[in-house]
Amino acid sequence: MEIIIAFFLYLNDKRKKRFLFKKSKIPLMIITNNDIVMCPIWYNYQVNTVFLPCAHVACYLCSKIIKNCHLCRRKILKTQFFKLP
């Protein structure tokens, strides 16, 4: 059984217009029952926090420590907790 989790980003007006034309570009994370997605920073904990506006993920502990995204280096404006089944 596959579970699809879509992260909807807060987008500024310019990005919203681009987004409407490219609906197929919604960032998706496809997770199967056998997958365990580990934190890309520590590799000790399962991911459960998404950074906004970039939508990259990490574990809760890492999300509390870092101010800029570890992948794209964008400033983290907000974090959103999520729970994988």
From Swiss-Prot:
Record keyword Zinc-finger present: yes
Keywords: Metal-binding, Zinc, Zinc-finger
GO molecular function ontology, one term from the record: zinc ion binding
A UniProt-annotated Pfam family: zf-C3HC4_3
Record carries keyword Transmembrane: no
InterPro entries in the cross-refs: Znf_RING/FYVE/PHD
ZnF locations on chain (RING-type): 39-73
Superkingdom in the source lineage: Viruses
Name of the protein described by the UniProt record: Putative RING finger protein 095L
Species assigned in the record: Invertebrate iridescent virus 6 (IIV-6)
Phylogenetic placement of the source organism: Viruses, Varidnaviria, Bamfordvirae, Nucleocytoviricota, Megaviricetes
